[in-house]
């Protein structure tokens, strides 16, 4: 019985060791084989990872195409796909870097508007709440305006125009938040300045009606009924 137990334990250890070795060899072969794959094969693997939701793996594989086959026809497309995968992973800085690299390397390519849009939407997707620093909103506006001005007939220009209005709404919301605070604290002049910004700079936003109402309220509180 003791011999049988010892044999089973020994066999289990050897099986586990063999499994570890095989897994290690498999991973090693995968890494080595990547160099031997064609650009098309690596691209297919990258797309498969992307579709399955493994954005990090997809981004890495797309980047490998540029490294191994920098002059292939797929290198250009892979760079843009890398930017998209990184954006989906919410790695906005790296995504923008890849998109900017694409624009710099292929300035005349038909997908340059798309690359600009990736940059713009990366900023836009970081506007998550009105209490956040609004610098990111201005960066988004700048990027969207670039698309509208340079590629006015593209689908990206239409989407950018809509996003500009939404970004304006974020900025107006921030001004309203500050204006309400000043009004509550009876700092009427400061409140008036904020509400005027909404009315004059963001007149088409959903916050304009309230801004007008608060502006009148602030003037009445100052006793300036004729303003």
Question: Where are the predicted features?
Answer:
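Sec-dependent bacterial lipoprotein signal peptides
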Residues: 1-25
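Acidic, polar-rich low-complexity tracts and alpha-helical solenoid repeat scaffolds
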Residues: 4, 25-227
